Design a protein with these regions (language model features):
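Membrane-embedded alpha-helical bundles of multi-pass transporters/translocases
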Residues: 2-408
């Protein structure tokens, strides 16, 4: 098969690892540290936001470094994969030897830095692999993002699936993640090439490019709804729906639908163009997810249907936007490192923003993680933040995309 000769499955596996690292940080880790160690949601939100501000400086620097790696590139990237694995073990499998909030900050910093460096190099390598062929970028994105979404599915279900099987489900997940990370790094080893251009990219040139700048702004606005819903998902399922224990299966439904839909959106984009297909998917996302506002406690089945429908639409976001940006980088910044440093920055900033704004608002309404006796205003606040805010933000993203001319 052509895909095997091009080693595209290696990209699928590595993308699965990276996405599997991201889900625990944003969805499981805050609740785990709040439930297990009694850490304040406000403190966790503030710390996550502070770490993301650190990323504002870190990601462009890591992109700058990535474009200047030469002979040692393979070794440095592989060592970074070790850091990613060890940081996950530290976060979930080792009891904090210091104050839990500071241990959380230390291990998450290791995860953030390793994740950022690996992601930047991974997506930049995709730019050079696909070249300037528009169909090549969309095709690679389909393999890559399908792997990413499958990785999220596994990361979503394993911790809850291991309850009753493993003494410490999150520790078992962390050790399993570390092993898979090293396997994926082994298969990606031959893919890490030196930079494709002798002249490293200048970040100013990327920002000054009209199309690249518009895509970055669109990514920032469009990623925020998913950041909001991801941050509050566990709390919504447990406290609003009263469906504790269903978190893993529901997450799997959402991301599996996204993974299955990803090649379909990719094929549609090759035929009809990325922009009209993406607009269609975003409109369908609002139509499906908006129904969440009408749910009552016990409505697990209707919510499962919403997870499938909205997950299928998210597959377009996660496949087409990175492909559009990579296609532009192939023209103005062939090395890709600086560009995807910026891309990482805007996407991760939305998660930080969601944490620092939403978690304190939730706590001030009287919400206490794990409590079975919450005041009505806490449930109302949770519902509005989880269901209404993402829908409004998605409408803003749709308006922006419609009004934006992305073609040169």
């Amino acid at each position: 098969m052509k895909a095997l000769s091009e080693r595209l499955p290696a990209y699928t596996g590595f993308a699965a690892v990276l996405s599997g690292a991201g889900l625990p940080i944003y969805i499981y880790a805050p609740k785990y540290y709040a439930d297990t160690y009694g850490v304040s949601l406000t403190a966790l939100g503030a710390l996550l936001f502070g770490l993301r501000l650190f990323d504002v400086v870190q990601d462009p620097i890591l992109g700058w470094i990535s474009e200047r790696l030469t002979d040692a590139k393979k070794l440095i990237i592989t060592l970074t994969a070790f850091v990613l694995a060890l940081s996950m073990i530290g976060l979930f499998a080792i009891a904090p030897p210091i104050s839990p909030i500071w241990w959380f900050g230390l291990t998450v910093t290791g995860l953030f830095t390793a994740f950022s460096f690996l992601s930047i190099n991974f997506y930049a390598q995709g730019v050079s692999k696909a070249g300037k062929d528009p169909k090549g970028h969309v095709r690679l994105a389909a393999w890559r993002e399908s792997g990413a979404l499958l990785g999220v599915c596994v990361a979503a279900v394993i911790p809850t699936a291991l309850i009753g099987i493993a003494a410490d489900p999150f520790a078992a997940f962390a050790y399993g993640f570390a092993a898979v990370t090293l396997i994926a790094a082994f298969f990606m080893w031959p893919e890490w090439k030196e930079r494709v251009s002798n002249e490293p990219s200048q970040i100013g040139e990327i920002i000054r490019d009209s199309t690249a700048r518009k895509l970055l702004i669109l990514a920032l606005v469009n990623a925020t709804p998913l950041a909001v819903s991801s941050t509050l998902f566990l709390f919504y399922v447990e406290s609003k729906l009263g469906a504790a224990g269903w978190e893993g299966p529901l997450l799997v439904l959402f991301f599996l639908a996204a993974a299955v839909s990803s090649p379909i959106w990719s094929a549609l984009a090759r035929r009809y163009g990325e922009k009209p297909v993406l607009i269609t998917a975003m409109i369908l996302a609002v139509a499906s997810f908006g129904y969440t506002l009408t749910l009552s406690p016990g409505d697990v089945i209707p919510f499962a249907v919403i997870c499938v429908l909205s997950g299928a639409t998210i597959g377009a976001d996660l496949t087409l936007l990175p492909a559009m940006f990579a296609k532009r980088m192939a023209v103005i910044s062939p090395n890709g490192g600086q560009g995807f440093g910026l891309w990482n920055l805007v996407n991760k900033f939305t998660l930080a923003f969601a944490a620092v704004v939403l978690l304190p608002l939730l706590e001030r309404s009287g919400f206490v993680a794990g409590s079975t006796d919450l005041p009505p205003e806490a449930i109302t606040t949770l519902t509005m933040l989880y269901a209404l805010v993402p829908s409004l933000l998605k409408l803003l993203a749709i308006s922006l995309l419609i009004a934006t001319k992305l073609e040169d």
